[in-house]
């Protein structure tokens, strides 16, 4: 059984008799000497989708829920539902747009390496690869000879995500984006 300090974003945990999916974790360090470090977790109930914010001391023991990961690819949009297809047995997994809004900024039909987290036979979340390749649709014109400077400019991707890119990058180029930090890594 891991401590609260060992829990990572994207984990499925058991708390108060329910299974929750951890979406965000923030570390709170009190300014007093004797205060214990707290971990504030934003979690979603797997069964109902209800949001819950809980704080745990760093050494609180937390039960991990049983879950599995399945490799999948984005298939199509059906109204407000996004459908992903299992890469091995072609099982469709449906997600409501609001439940995966943040992940959708990185997902296109070409995105490889998606993982679906399944708890009790139901899909609960999408795990993104560490980096994805996206195409730039809107940015300021590239500046010749700007490769020596470290200045950046905003660029909008095909998914609507906006990141800072070097000045020498132009519209239509594919770039590699870090999905955890939302930052430009390199040309694709």
Swiss-Prot record:
What InterPro entries does this protein map onto? Elong-fact-P_C, NA-bd_OB-fold, Rib_uL2_dom2, Transl_elong_fac_P/YeiP, Transl_elong_KOW-like, Transl_elong_p-like_YeiP, Transl_elong_P/YeiP_cen, Transl_elong_P/YeiP_CS
Known SMART domains for this protein? EFP, Elong-fact-P_C
Q: Which Pfam families match?
A: EFP, EFP_N, Elong-fact-P_C
State the SUPFAM superfamilies in the record: Nucleic acid-binding proteins, Translation proteins SH3-like domain
UniProt GO MF annotations: translation elongation factor activity
Q: Which GO terms describe its biological process?
A: peptide biosynthetic process
| CC terms in the record's Gene Ontology section | cytoplasm
Q: List the PROSITE patterns hit by this protein, alphabetically.
A: EFP
Query: Which family does the record assign?
Result: Belongs to the elongation factor P family.
Protein name as catalogued: Elongation factor P-like protein
């Amino acid at each position: 059984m891991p401590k609260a300090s060992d829990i990572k974003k994207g984990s499925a945990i058991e708390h108060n008799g329910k299974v929750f999916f951890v979406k965000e974790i923030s570390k709170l360090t009190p300014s007093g000497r004797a205060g214990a470090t707290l971990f504030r977790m934003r979690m979603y109930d797997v069964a109902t989708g209800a949001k819950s914010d809980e704080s745990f001391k760093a050494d609180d023991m937390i039960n991990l829920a049983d879950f599995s990961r399945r490799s999948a690819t984005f298939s199509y949009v059906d109204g407000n539902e996004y459908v992903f297809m299992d890469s091995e047995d072609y099982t469709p997994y449906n997600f409501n747009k609001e439940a995966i809004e943040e992940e959708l900024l990185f997902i296109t039909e070409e995105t490889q390496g998606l993982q679906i987290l399944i708890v009790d036979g139901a899909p609960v979340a999408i795990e993104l690869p560490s980096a994805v390749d996206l195409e730039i649709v809107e940015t300021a014109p590239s500046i010749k000879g700007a490769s020596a400077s470290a200045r950046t400019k905003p660029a909008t991707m095909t998914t609507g995500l906006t990141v800072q890119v070097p000045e020498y990058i132009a519209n239509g180029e594919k770039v590699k984006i870090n999905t955890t930090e939302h930052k430009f890594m390199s040309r694709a």
